Curated annotation (Swiss-Prot):
GO terms for biological process: translation. It comes from Salinibacter ruber (strain DSM 13855 / M31). CDD domains: Ribosomal_L25_TL5_CTC. The gene is rplY. HAMAP family: Ribosomal_bL25_CTC. Part of the 50S ribosomal subunit; part of the 5S rRNA/L5/L18/L25 subcomplex. Contacts the 5S rRNA. Binds to the 5S rRNA independently of L5 and L18. This is Large ribosomal subunit protein bL25. It comes from the Bacteria. This is one of the proteins that binds to the 5S RNA in the ribosome where it forms part of the central protuberance. GO terms for cellular component: cytosolic large ribosomal subunit. Residues 198-250 are annotated as: Disordered.
Amino acid sequence: MTGHLPRLLSPFSPDRLPVMDAPVIEAQPRETGSKAAREIRNNDRVPCVLYGRTVESTPLQIPIAALNKLIYRRSAPVAEVEMNGDTWNCILKDYDLHPLTDRPLHADFQALEEGDEVTLTVPLNYTGIPVGQQNGGDTQQIARELTISVLPENIPAQIEVDIGELVIGDSLHVYDLETDYEIKTSRDQTLVTVVAPQIETAPTTEAEEEEEELTEEEIAEEGEAVDTEEGEPAEGEEAAGEGGADEEYQ
């Protein structure tokens, strides 16, 4: 953390998500190949693959709605996949989206193995209102999730981070977190920063601009009038001068 803070924050307080609380997804076997995949997608389902250390790679299909819920759920992507009477505790390891519609095209599920750590991405949940924000600062949340390596029984639903003590000028990084498992995200990754408010200059109104233009024009006109008065003789004086010269040379 940067700034004046000499203290060490302990912001990490994971909310455990037992695998038994994971959503259940009903899957069906599927054929492989591009033609079969297109037919599956046309029926609002997604072709998937399930694999694991002790699980043979298994092609399957699931409802697109079930996958969308898992993708956009604000918790660890853990699920129970059921097919033909078998159940696997899994994580959503990877998925592909259509580049234009964001429709899921394919997904990979990794079966969780007892005693084997698994690497997955878990959402961050920031709690508290920074002191700096209460004093007019702006809180910028840079990171929304972290990649961690953890045993299946210790997978957190979210990574809860307390940012209430941050003042203006403070930043929170991955290396500030105290965890009981390995964080794969770079230690130098900034999570949150609190910056001073931006002072905006009041925009000049059209009326003020017109008034300034008129004032400049008036000043210019007054200057021309002064030059005329000082540099040119009056009409009477010019006539008198001309007459005197004629009389002198007659």
